[in-house]
From Swiss-Prot:
Result of altering residue 255 to A/N: Complete loss of activity
Result for mutant: residue 260 to A: Severe decrease in catalytic efficiency with a 3-fold decrease in the affinity for ATP and for Mg(2+). No inhibition at high Mg(2+) concentrations. Activated by low concentrations of Ca(2+) and inhibited by high concentrations of Ca(2+)
PANTHER family in the record: CHOLINE KINASE A2, CHOLINE/ETHANOALAMINE KINASE
Keywords: ATP-binding, Calcium, Kinase, Lipid biosynthesis, Lipid metabolism, Magnesium, Metal-binding, Nucleotide-binding, Phospholipid biosynthesis, Phospholipid metabolism, Transferase
Annotated binding of Ca(2+), by residue: 258, 320, 323
GO cellular component: cytoplasm
UniProt subunit comment: Homodimer. A small proportion exists as higher oligomers.
Protein name: Choline kinase A2
Annotated catalysed reactions: choline + ATP = phosphocholine + ADP + H(+); ethanolamine + ATP = phosphoethanolamine + ADP + H(+)
Similarity section: Belongs to the choline/ethanolamine kinase family.
Length: 429
């Protein structure tokens, strides 16, 4: 994170001390890990790459100790796990011949980021991850290094694009989002993350492509192409309109897509299954107050999380109903705009959201839910612009096999298609 951002962030001493206790490896010490992965054939067995295995072993030995310090390389197994679009995931595990000596885990998740926000957002993300871990709302954090981290491996599977729109799953997601929005997190609370991130990304993009380079857009959006200067002007237009929004500012996930919503298996490590007494008490910081007979859902990957207008979280999630990332052929995603939720589906989501937060009278729920629909829709183009610019930059940064160029252009096309909704940002009361 930049020194300017660190100096103005306000941290609770106990939370910050907990994050500080994690060994933060010196800047650049393990930067070679990212360089190595950038040149790696994604279909290659990670165990056949000695340099990768050695670096993973070094990280596990330093952060985990115990058997991880003594296990020979041939008894350390590494396998790549399908993960997010801006990181690479590896499951590291000890062989049965080298069981844990103390309380160290026998398997961990190694996450390496190719996210343009990693350097500027590192302190905030570390605090967020540590806080969620300590409150049993997320995996345990074992270590942080420049460009990645070691975390608890939770046997689970992500929801599919189809599943997040199912009524019973959408109800659970709404309840979890309600609790996320009630969290008090010791980070900067001004809702300026979106525009500041976009400004950083555009600066990076300008440094990697020719200033006159034009990105062709699909014909139906009405804008044939854009360059970096055009995008910078659109950002200022967005900034001016977003600043008028009356949507409440809360702690937001900012990336509630299918891959970041997990359905854990029966044994779920650090994720706490709430008791009936927990539900009755309605603890403000619990992510998962729900019927214990129901399957749990866990929100992960808070790498883009910040204080933000809550309507962005809603709009962004509803857009994800339309984007399927589980596609085996290039560009490895499919956008079906007709799957955007109908008005009654959004109303049902918001009814569950408001009930879970518990501060709205029953006779006011429907009207408040209607208001939330109107609060949310103007942020649809904001989400498209945010991830559109992100996609164009990922072309230059990420080795993950995904059609980032197509994705960026498609999202920008949808931004221009829905741009007129921005005029309603100031009208929500």
């Amino acid at each position: 994170m930049s020194s300017r951002k660190v100096s103005r962030a306000h941290y609770d001493e106990d939370e910050l001390a907990s994050a500080a206790n994690m060994s933060l490896v010196a800047e650049g010490h393990f930067r070679g890990m990212k360089e190595l992965l950038s040149t790696m054939d994604l279909d290659t067995d990670a165990n056949t790459i000695p340099e990768l295995k050695e670096r993973a072993h070094m990280l596990c030995a330093r952060f985990l100790g115990g058997a991880w310090k003594t296990v020979p390389l041939e008894h350390l197994r590494i396998s790549r796990i399908k993960g997010g679009m801006s990181n690479m995931l590896f499951l590291c595990r000890l062989s049965e011949v080298y069981p844990p000596i103390r309380n160290e885990p026998n398997k961990v998740l190694l996450r390496v980021y190719f996210n343009p926000e990693t350097e500027s957002h590192l302190v905030a993300e570390s605090v967020i991850f540590t806080l969620l871990s300590e409150r049993h709302l997320g995996p345990k954090l074992y270590g942080i290094f420049s460009g990645g981290r070691l975390e608890e491996y939770i046997p689970s599977r992500p929801l599919s694009c189809h599943e997040i729109s199912l009524a019973h799953m959408s109800t659970k997601i709404a309840k979890r989002v309600a609790k996320v929005h009630q969290l008090e997190v010791p980070i900067w609370k001004e809702p300026d993350y979106l525009c500041e991130a976009l400004q950083r990304w555009l600066k990076q993009l300008t440094g990697t492509v020719d200033a006159e380079h034009r990105f062709d857009l699909p014909e139906e959006c009405g804008v044939s192409s854009v360059n970096c200067l055009d995008l910078a002007r659109e950002l200022e237009f967005l900034r001016a309109h977003i600043s008028l929004s009356k949507s409440p500012v809360t702690f937001c996930h900012n990336d509630l897509q299918e891959g970041n919503i997990l359905l854990p298996k029966a044994s779920s490590g650090n994720i706490r299954m709430p008791s009936l007494s927990d539900e009755t008490q309605a603890l403000g910081n619990s992510l998962s107050a729900f019927n214990p007979a129901d399957p749990r859902l866990v929100l992960i990957d808070f790498e883009y999380a910040s204080y933000n207008y809550r309507a962005f979280d809603f709009a962004n999630h509803f857009i994800e109903w339309t984007i399927d990332y589980d596609i085996d052929e290039a560009p490895f995603y499919k956008i079906q705009t007709e799957n955007f939720p109908e008005n009654d589906q959004m109303l049902e989501f918001f009814l569950n959201y408001l009930r879970e937060q518990g501060n709205t009278r029953e006779n006011e729920l429907y009207k408040k839910s209607e208001d939330l629909v109107q609060e949310t829709l103007p942020f649809v183009p904001v989400s498209h612009f945010f991830w559109g610019v992100w996609g164009l930059l990922q072309v230059e940064l990420s080795p993950v096999g995904f059609g980032f160029a197509d994705y960026g252009r498609d999202r920008l096309s949808l931004y221009f298609k829905h741009k007129q909704l921005l005029k309603n940002l100031a009208s929500h009361q």
